[in-house]
Amino acid sequence: MSSPRPVLPTTPAPPIVWKKPPQDIVKVNFGFWGQADCGIASAVARDHNGTPLAISYCKIPSADPLKGNALAAYGALKLGLSKEWRAIYLEGDSLDVIHYLQGNRVAPSHISSVVFDSVALLKSFGCAFPVWVDPKANIFAHSVCRWAAEKNLQNDLTWQLMPSSLVSLFEEASKV
């Protein structure tokens, strides 16, 4: 009979949190939240201190997460261009979409035009880096999606900027 092996203590994993970008780079996180027959895409832009600079959201007539995340990335890039930011980190938790934007994989046909347009937009910045982020570090973008889902928006693919008076409601989420 063998003797029992001692149980070694485990080291807890460090918490996954949003990381600040360098001072001259704006970080734009994109997210998607699907419902039964539609979804909400969001883009949250923050500076090097984590302060929200702009938040936008859009209801889309698709619950497909791949399509929703591709459209969210496109909306995040359009937000960055509209604000005339020269350098951005484009962060999302869809690894597939990030790979498509980086040129590491070919996008499936149902989103290829959105990916193509997004890659063209990426080239409009002085520098732009599509980066995958763990969903736990993308909570702010997902919180905006859930908030917008409650607003009963129209399915017209119109991106709306969150009024600055409401941005403060999400200030706590920006600390994550």
Label for each model-derived stretch:
Residues 1-176:
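Primary recognition of RNase H-like, Mg2+-dependent phosphodiesterase/nuclease domains
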